[in-house]
C-alpha cells in the first residue's frame, strides 16, 4: 500500500493546525510556506478535510483554518480513510470462490495485514504526533 502525497500533506497540515489549536486561525499560505506544499494543492486537500468535518474556516482579516475538535480526538486513521478511502493492503476481491487458494491467502495474509495497519493508525492521535514532535524539538542541540 502506498500512501499518496495528498494524504501525507493532509496529515502534516492537520498536525500543523493541531500545534496551533489554541492559537489563531491559520492561513493556507502560512502552511504552504512552512511546509513547502503548493498552495493550490493544499486548497484541494483542505476542501476534502472540511467536507469530512476535520477542519473548518472563517473568513476575514483574522480568518483561516482550524481543527473542529481537539487534536486528542482526531486519529491518523480518520484522516487516511477520509483522503485515501480505505486502508486495505490490496483491492477487495468480490468474485473469488471460497475453495480457491486466493480466498485462503486473502483471509490468512492480506486481511490480517490490513487489520494490523488499521489497529496501528487507529491508536495514534494528532496529539500523539504533536507530543513526539515537541519532545524531539526540545532535545535538539544547536552549535
Regions found by a protein language model. Give the residues of each.
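Key DNA-contact positions within bacterial/archaeal DNA-binding proteins
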Residues: 40
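Beta-hairpin "wing" of winged helix-turn-helix
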Residues: 54-62, 66-67
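Short amphipathic alpha-helical interface segments
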Residues: 10-22
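Short acidic, hydrophobic short linear motifs in intrinsically disordered regions
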Residues: 24-29
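Conserved segment of winged-helix/HTH DNA-binding domains
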Residues: 71-95
Amino acid at each position: 500500500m502506498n500512501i499518496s502525497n495528498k494524504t501525507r500533506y493532509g496529515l502534516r497540515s492537520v498536525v500543523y493546525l493541531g500545534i496551533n489549536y489554541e492559537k489563531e486561525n491559520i492561513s493556507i499560505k502560512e502552511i504552504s510556506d512552512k511546509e513547502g506544499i503548493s498552495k493550490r494543492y493544499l486548497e484541494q486537500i483542505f476542501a476534502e478535510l472540511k467536507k469530512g468535518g476535520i477542519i473548518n474556516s472563517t473568513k476575514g482579516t483574522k480568518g483561516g483554518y482550524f481543527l473542529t475538535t481537539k487534536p486528542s480526538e482526531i486519529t491518523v486513521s480518520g484522516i487516511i480513510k477520509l483522503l485515501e478511502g480505505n486502508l486495505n493492503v490490496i483491492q477487495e476481491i468480490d468474485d473469488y470462490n471460497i475453495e480457491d487458494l486466493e480466498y485462503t491467502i486473502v483471509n490468512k495474509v492480506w486481511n490480517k495485514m490490513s487489520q494490523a495497519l488499521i489497529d496501528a493508525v487507529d491508536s495514534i492521535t494528532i496529539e500523539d504526533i504533536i507530543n513526539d514532535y515537541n519532545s524531539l524539538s526540545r532535545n535538539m542541540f544547536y552549535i
